Amino acid sequence: MKRTPLILLFAALLLTACDPGYTMEFAIDNQTTHAVTIQSLQPVDTVGHTISRLTPLSAPAQTDTVVWVTGGLGHASINIIAKDIEWHNYGDSVQLRFDDGRALNYYRDSTGFDALYRFEDANADTSLYRYEAIVNQRPPFKGNARYGKLTLVITDSLYNLSRPRP
């Protein structure tokens, strides 16, 4: 009988000390009338190490498609998904290729005409993506987000920046 309060105290400490899990999604909201494919431009670095494991991601015209899901211990954060996308999937540059042969390149830490969006930097041109964090109210004493979704929004104005490419 004396063990019951001790077991309850131990269970309460265990529940409050646990680092809960989170889920992050990366989606493409293609608002154009063209299908789009995202592909890595530099799958290996200068010494031959593979830096991109990305197979091309495709989004049909006028769809909102979840293309990648990750998770782990801790809480959802835009920085987590942005870093995971760059370092684990894209490498340092990607190309958005539309079904009519037009394309737009994005390079990390570049300021050129085609470098309007940097996947590793949450502050780079926020008009191109949106981030949503949902706070799980259970347990009530933990207010961190358990779910996050980063959506790359491809609009007609972005399509108009693209150029014909071979």
Label the model's feature ranges:
Residues 1-18:
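Sec-dependent bacterial lipoprotein signal peptides
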Residues 18-25, 39-166:
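Intrinsically disordered, low-complexity segments enriched in small/polar residues
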